């Protein structure tokens, strides 16, 4: 069991792995907070909390970033939110299982900004590839690994 101080935050509006988060969180007895711009349906469970952050631009992102702390985990595809959370000392994981780290977040943000610029000029069209079963499996592995890593860190003598 992991220290109850670890909380999993989910940027929930378009998250394709909410069910996987519920299962892993229940197995490790971790609280989950799903944050969305509006109402989302979540299972009734004492470990799961739903937050409607409001419809303002980046309202859900701001809500998460203002509360996340070292030892917490955020699930998001939003690279600027991931950057804010990593800077706060949290673990950030994309729904496809890709971890955002202090070492990778700068380059990831730069590539995101470049792609945004290229799309706005019409040089690139289309979006990311479809979410796959392999992405789901990679995500489950990444989340489980992150939880175990945080638990080891907290259990280590200081």
Curated annotation (Swiss-Prot):
InterPro entries: UPF0178. Pfam families: DUF188. It comes from the Bacteria. Belongs to the UPF0178 family. This is UPF0178 protein Rpal_2485. It comes from Rhodopseudomonas palustris (strain TIE-1). The lineage of its organism: Bacteria, Pseudomonadati, Pseudomonadota, Alphaproteobacteria, Hyphomicrobiales.
């Amino acid at each position: 069991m992991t220290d109850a101080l670890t909380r999993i935050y989910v940027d929930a509006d378009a998250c394709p792995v909410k069910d996987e988060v519920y299962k892993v969180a229940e197995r490790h007895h971790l609280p989950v907070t799903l944050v969305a711009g509006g109402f989302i349906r979540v299972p009734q469970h004492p470990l799961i909390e739903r937050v409607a952050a409001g419809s303002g631009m980046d309202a859900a992102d701001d809500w998460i970033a203002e509360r996340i702390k070292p030892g917490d985990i955020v699930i998001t595809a939003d690279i600027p939110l991931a950057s804010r959370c990593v800077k706060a000392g949290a673990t950030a994981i994309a729904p496809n299982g890709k971890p955002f780290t202090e070492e990778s977040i700068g380059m990831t943000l730069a590539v995101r900004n470049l792609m945004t610029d290229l799309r706005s000029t019409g040089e690139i069209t289309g979006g990311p590839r479809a979410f796959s079963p392999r992405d789901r499996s990679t995500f489950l592995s990444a989340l489980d690994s992150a939880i175990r890593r945080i638990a080891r860190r907290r259990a280590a003598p200081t």
